[in-house]
Amino acid sequence: MKTYIIYGKANSEYASGMLNKPQDRLPIIKNLTDQFGMKIREFLFTHTESFTFFSVLDANSDEDMESLMNITRASGTWTNMYWSRAFDSLEHMKIYEKAKTGMASYVTT
């Protein structure tokens, strides 16, 4: 599985819903991620200027991630919601090893 990071900013509709009915969102989201065979590693709320939610999860593909994000965005409770692929240190090294090999064909003038 591949590692992904999700981060976004909840809107006032989300805050209003939580004020009216405070609830643990993790079990609700887990039902959704389970449908895509994903594993949640971290599920965190924070209060920064840029984002109020941060999650790390494992998924099989970018397509699965984008499908999850489309459902999340359609809820209307997020100002923005983004995802990106994350690499551990060995994966990161392999990317640069591949780039180094590819660099041999790059000619500058």
List each model region and its residues.
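Short S/T/G/P-rich N-terminal loop/turn motif that feeds into the first structured element of a domain
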Residues: M1-F51, D62-D64, F87-T109
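An amphipathic, aromatic/His-enriched active-site/gating alpha helix that lines ligand/cofactor pockets
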Residues: D58-L90
